[in-house]
Structures are given as C-alpha cells and as structure tokens.
Regions:
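Alpha-helical ds-nucleic-acid-binding substructure associated with the helix-hairpin-helix region
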Residues: 3, 12-13, 19, 44-121
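Alpha-helical scaffold segments that form or flank carboxylate-/histidine-based iron centers
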Residues: 31-45
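Buried hydrophobic packing segments
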Residues: 39, 88-91, 131, 153
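Catalytic DNA-binding helix-loop module of base-excision-repair DNA glycosylases/AP lyases
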Residues: 43, 109-155
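Non-catalytic, surface-exposed connector residues within folded enzymatic/regulatory domains
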Residues: 82, 107, 143, 161-164
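Charged catalytic carboxylate motif
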Residues: 87, 148, 180
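A basic, often C-terminal nucleic-acid-binding module that engages the phosphate backbone, implemented
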Residues: 156-180
Length: 180
C-alpha cells in the first residue's frame, strides 16, 4: 500500500487541498515484485481490454508467474501472442541474468532506471515509471510526457496545469512526494 504514506498525505493536504479532497482516503494496491510488475505490464499492453482474462490465464498456466516458470513455458507462451511471449521471455532472461534487478535499479537515478527498463521489449516509459513508483517506492517520479498524469491534473486543476510551466510548478510544489 505505497507510496501513499502518512507523510505524503500530510504534505499533499498542506500544499494542495483540492487534490487531497479529490484523492480522499484512497488506498492503492501496488505490485511489489519486479518481475510480476513487468509481466503484468507486458500482458496488459498485449491484451488491453482482455487483460484480466489474459493475466488469469497466464497465472493458471504457469502456477506462479516467475522468471523461472516463464522460461520453462518457453514457446507455449505464444498462445498469448508472439510479441507478448517474446517480451515475457526477454524480461525473464533479463531478471535472471541480473541485467534488470531491484538492487541495480534502486542504485540508478530515475531517468537511468527508466532507460534500463525501457530497453526491454514492450516496456514503455509509462510502465517503467509505474515500476519505479510501485516496486521501487520512488516517491517523486512525475513526468510531463505522461498523458494520464496531465489528464488528471487538468480534471482537478484546469487546463493551465497541463502546460509545461503549470506542470513544473505542480511538480515543485508537491516535491518530494509528487508520485503520491
């Protein structure tokens, strides 16, 4: 249940009561396992609206969604689509080889960690940022190029918040808990 910690909520209430009211007492369930977060993001990208079914099917087939089980399944994963299968296999190999790992990512600045994650097939900036926030618990990862963030800002604060200047002002005001 992170990164929405008590200090983050307290900061949000003090600097942005309008957003605090919109968020309310929301609690967000975030994936804590790196590979599971990668796999969910990859399957979600490949299955889109059918994600819940596709994820349940993958979990049922593998028993446990882990890099080892993905590699064991190998070509059978093509039932989920060739692109998704290649992406899952690549992510599994990267995690098992240490190319992508919690310790390595935790040691990198946000932009570099995003770059490492985006080097994997089917991992885009938005998924990489979700992993930084959810798995690595980075409390202040906000990007102007994230349309979902800008859309939410516009709903709460109006169109001016979506300009580069408005976004940067928002980000500065909410630091160090911008992700919350």
């Amino acid at each position: 249940m992170a990164p929405l910690t008590d200090p983050a909520f307290a900061r949000l209430r003090s600097v942005d009561p309008v957003l605090a009211e919109a968020v309310g007492d929301a609690v967000f369930e975030l994936e804590t396992d790196l590979f599971t977060a990668l796999a969910k993001g990859i399957v979600e990208k490949g299955a889109s609206d059918a994600f819940p079914f596709a994820w349940a099917s993958l979990a049922a087939r593998l028993g446990e969604v882990s890099p080892e089980r993905v590699l064991e399944a190998g070509p059978a994963l093509e039932d989920f689509g060739k692109k998704t299968a290649k992406a899952l296999l690549g992510a599994a190999k990267a995690v098992l080889s240490g190319k992508i790992g919690m310790e390595r990512l935790a040691a990198l600045p946000d932009d570099e960690a995003v770059g490492v994650l985006c080097s994997l097939r089917c991992v885009d900036v938005r998924l990489a940022v979700r992993i930084l926030i959810g798995v690595l618990r980075r409390p202040d990862v906000l990007r102007f190029d994230d349309e979902a963030v800008r859309s939410g800002l516009m709903r709460v604060h109006g169109p001016r918040s979506c300009t580069r200047e408005g976004f940067e002002a928002f980000r500065a005001r909410h630091a160090p808990f911008g992700s919350a």
